[in-house]
Amino acid sequence: MKILVDENMPYVEPLFGDLGEIIPVNGRTLTAAQVRDADVLLVRSVTKVNAELLSDNHQLKFVGSATIGTDHVDLAYLGERNIPFSNAPGCNATAVGEFAFIAMLELAQRFDSPLKGKVVGIVGAGNTGTATAKCLQAYGIKVLLNDPIKEKQGDPRSFVSLETIMAQADIISLHVPITRTGEHKTKHLFDEARLTALKPNTWLVNCCRGDVIDNKALVRVKRQRDDLKLVLDVWEGEPTPMPELVPLAEFATPHIAGYSLEGKARGTFMLYQKLCQLLNIAADKSLLDLLPSFNIKAVELATAPDEKALLQLARFVYDLRDDDKMFRNIFLNENGFDTMRKNHRHRREFSALALAYDRQLEVDWLSNLGFSGVGQ
């Protein structure tokens, strides 16, 4: 069995090596000729899976995407050809949630404006939005959720309108899929009018899709409003973001919010489980066995951490400033965006760091944030 796999997917060899011949490929430049004789195709969001890519292949048994979203896959076409498909919903939700939370802590420190006491509006209450809310609520932050689709579907959580978030939230974090038509279109959801209407000193965090914000309008509005603070992990026109926009963001990264070691391993592992199920064989590999031990064994706390100390704990796991600095130095280079993504030194999630502190009730919130070993 020939397994064609994006070269940037981790842990492919230990998981799929027993199932067939593994052929790594560049996902962004993948051609129909390369795919012609593949039995299994494993991709990420940079690969457009459609008739143009697959029309010459008449033996494909499975297409898997190690991503939350599926907007890069023509699901109708796969359905017409009866090609089984699976993605990895939620695989990197924890990573995105922690990234957004860390970014907010970094902004709070940079501008001496504590996160504690602020109101955060989350637009999109799916896997990544929910994970972001979980971090914030663990820390005691008031969260407003906006998701008209989930609200209409009967999700029991409390939702508010986008207008309410615009009026009440100090921070707005975006977590919607990209939809270009229909009642709940998200392309340019934040257009020039909505960006202009943001209340003073709003922090705007985008970890979903670049097209959700009109980037040209964002440049114009930001140049007029220095009070707005931006954290941008996604960009219109990836992998070539607007050169004028990057310097206007407080933190800028190349679509890596979901790039934790745990998240990327989880995505590959979910596809492994699905393929084994399809082939009717036992999935006898373990996700935990894939992950290396963390380079810090444990952190012993003398007191319950304040916000500054919490940021330091977060930086032990992931220092956003490093990726921001690297991105600013490389994004104008040819292939700089993709090079940084490909060579990203997969950060860890909070669960990799064990904390030792004996007053359990004072630090339950750290366990809820995801840190391990608290109070043990």
Swiss-Prot record:
UniProt cross-references to Pfam families, sorted A to Z: 2-Hacid_dh, 2-Hacid_dh_C, DUF3410
Keyword tags: Cytoplasm, NAD, Oxidoreductase, Pyridoxine biosynthesis
SUPFAM superfamilies tied to this protein: Formate/glycerate dehydrogenase catalytic domain-like (SSF52283), NAD(P)-binding Rossmann-fold domains (SSF51735)
Binding annotation for substrate: S45, T67, Y259
Top-level taxon of the source organism: Bacteria
UniProt-listed InterPro entries: D-iso_2-hydroxyacid_DH_PdxB (IPR050418), D-isomer_2_OHA_DH_cat_dom (IPR006139), D-isomer_DH_CS (IPR029753), D-isomer_DH_NAD-bd (IPR006140), Erythronate-4-P_DHase (IPR020921), Erythronate-4-P_DHase_dimer (IPR024531), NAD(P)-bd_dom_sf (IPR036291), PdxB_dimer_sf (IPR038251)
Function: Catalyzes the oxidation of erythronate-4-phosphate to 3-hydroxy-2-oxo-4-phosphonooxybutanoate.
Subunit-level organization: Homodimer.
Homology family: Belongs to the D-isomer specific 2-hydroxyacid dehydrogenase family. PdxB subfamily.
PANTHER family: D-ISOMER SPECIFIC 2-HYDROXYACID DEHYDROGENASE CATALYTIC DOMAIN-CONTAINING PROTEIN-RELATED, D-ISOMER SPECIFIC 2-HYDROXYACID DEHYDROGENASE FAMILY PROTEIN (AFU_ORTHOLOGUE AFUA_1G13630)
Alphabetical list of HAMAP family matching this protein: PdxB
Protein's name according to its UniProt entry: Erythronate-4-phosphate dehydrogenase
